[in-house]
Amino acid sequence: MAGKKGQKKSGLGNHGKNSDMDVEDRLQAVVLTDSYETRFMPLTAVKPRCLLPLANVPLIEYTLEFLAKAGVHEVFLICSSHANQINDYIENSKWNLPWSPFKITTIMSPEARCTGDVMRDLDNRGIITGDFILVSGDVLTNIDFSKMLEFHKKMHLQDKDHISTMCLSKASTYPKTRTIEPAAFVLDKSTSRCIYYQDLPLPSSREKTSIQIDPELLDNVDEFVIRNDLIDCRIDICTSHVPLIFQENFDYQSLRTDFVKGVISSDILGKHIYAYLTDEYAVRVESWQTYDTISQDFLGRWCYPLVLDSNIQDDQTYSYESRHIYKEKDVVLAQSCKIGKCTAIGSGTKIGEGTKIENSVIGRNCQIGENIRIKNSFIWDDCIIGNNSIIDHSLIASNATLGSNVRLNDGCIIGFNVKIDDNMDLDRNTKISASPLKNAGSRMYDNESNEQFDQDLDDQTLAVSIVGDKGVGYIYESEVSDDEDSSTEACKEINTLSNQLDELYLSDDSISSATKKTKKRRTMSVNSIYTDREEIDSEFEDEDFEKEGIATVERAMENNHDLDTALLELNTLRMSMNVTYHEVRIATITALLRRVYHFIATQTLGPKDAVVKVFNQWGLLFKRQAFDEEEYIDLMNIIMEKIVEQSFDKPDLILFSALVSLYDNDIIEEDVIYKWWDNVSTDPRYDEVKKLTVKWVEWLQNADEESSSEEE
């Protein structure tokens, strides 16, 4: 995480007004300015999502307005991508003035790759003094926060294990704003305590799913409800324990999928999370789909009293007209142009003769030509639109230029500073940026400076067909569709622990908390020698035993047999087929990992919890399958190999959790782990799976050295 030098103070706010207030009574807020997603690419390659305008107002302004009305005393803006832009914006905003309702501080955290990283950074900094609001920088809401805070305090008094309250709005009230991250919440009907959480597939996928709840979670619950009609607006009230829990569980990345699901299903933590349900308007701008819908809602005054003509920015001059039309001062409209319902136009914009605009937002200082049709679209500041163009359900970012007779079909995104030549017709869902995005699967379409790119004839022809002879732009091709992309998927594909361990700052406390076992003092022989396990030629491997052995272990787990029965069946099978314990270990590990994979795939448990559940119960089988140091080393090699073969999303977390379980249960000794690690395979295909284990082994070795020093 970023060190102290990454923290910049952006003004005193009302610091003097609250200087005498008890530190614990000061309501703090943490704003996540980065979503750690790619849904708003290619625009977010240039500007952070929180500074993108919605109805000509930067998204962050809506979040800060909410916090001001909520009575927050101190705000921390966590900035990852484009951190300097955000800091500069805040320093020049009203929130940095002496009469600001709160003190605001920007915290540079460029290494953060998910919400979990941010929470661990907060814990390291020690700046959270009590309960705090955790909110995304893309929230739009008119909720009465005092009621949510009252509910939070009430639950905290009634339940000493209460650590967090989620705000969930009812989607039936605002059906079009339903999230593209659907989820099921199982709630205690009488208290709204969250009993279980599960991500759901998108409705468009038509994938069938079911909710599988551990019956133990329903203990002491008289009646529960299953809700999949709730909008998760990512407004949470957290106690100071929340960052610490993220610190102790450094595999937690997502706020819901990892933290909420992990906490409420953990017997060890024993903490509770509650849901505050509201009928008020509370949504996140989490995708292009919700950007479109929320913009129309806002123009339609669904978020009253937060409306465009309230002019929340000091330089705004919007006035409200009938049919939800908003205009700033100094707008020039030709006599024959027609402005339809739900339309906003910024100051300095000129609209030509015969142009028709409906259900759209036009920014400031735009030049809209003659006989243009703009419907259900968004045109940001300083754009130029040539005559006779048609723009349908598209977005044009600031400083873009469209020539005459240009047609943008449904879903087009034109990036900052892009130029489209005359007479161009862009296909649906075309996304264009002004510069190449090499890491995003984009191809170059710039006819003014293409010398550094080696393009074939087809690409050159296609470039002309997209932006025209005088156009400037690069096609952006997302590897994941907007609807499929999510914070969870982004963390999996780009920024997970398994892919970016070198960017994850792990503390010794994080690793030590994962290893609950008290350290044992042992000495490691300096002359011990590791011998590779005897290789068995594939022609002599008994495939029939592996198949039968796996089935035997799976049957034992499915029917919850006791260990002695499972061992007896395996041993009988081993002797009847005349195979070695090496084959028995392979079959057992394969079956256990399949069980782990099943729990993860069905979303019954997270990766770490699934491994702990399976290996804590069935790992004792290995005590009767390995009898010396060499065989335990063989066991660890098999585990690593089979995890790679199984293609887990987080292979390093699976291996780490499995080894910790075996170590905690006294199945594998510490000195054996050291010898295995000193001689572990250097094959590149194992590099990813070993990334977490290296940290754990280092921690074990450091703890050994500290123990030796204490004895001396």
Curated annotation (Swiss-Prot):
The keyword Heme does not apply. GO terms for molecular function: guanyl-nucleotide exchange factor activity; translation initiation factor activity; translation initiation factor binding. Residues 539-710 form the W2 domain. Keywords: Cytoplasm, Initiation factor, Phosphoprotein, Protein biosynthesis, Translation regulation. The modification Phosphoserine is found at S478, S481, S507, S525, S538, S707. Its main location: cytoplasm. GO terms for cellular component: cytoplasm; cytosol; eukaryotic translation initiation factor 2B complex; guanyl-nucleotide exchange factor complex. PROSITE patterns: W2. Acts as a catalytic component of the translation initiation factor 2B (eIF2B) complex, which catalyzes the exchange of GDP for GTP on eukaryotic initiation factor 2 (eIF2) and is regulated by phosphorylated eIF2. Its guanine nucleotide exchange factor activity is repressed when bound to eIF2 complex phosphorylated on the alpha subunit, thereby limiting the amount of methionyl-initiator methionine tRNA available to the ribosome and consequently global translation is repressed. Belongs to the eIF-2B gamma/epsilon subunits family. Component of the translation initiation factor 2B (eIF2B) complex which is a heterodecamer of two sets of five different subunits: alpha, beta, gamma, delta and epsilon. Subunits alpha, beta and delta comprise a regulatory subcomplex and subunits epsilon and gamma comprise a catalytic subcomplex. Within the complex, the hexameric regulatory complex resides at the center, with the two heterodimeric catalytic subcomplexes bound on opposite sides. Present with 33800 molecules/cell in log phase SD medium. This is Translation initiation factor eIF2B subunit epsilon. It comes from Saccharomyces cerevisiae (strain ATCC 204508 / S288c). The lineage of its organism: Eukaryota, Fungi, Dikarya, Ascomycota, Saccharomycotina. The gene is GCD6.
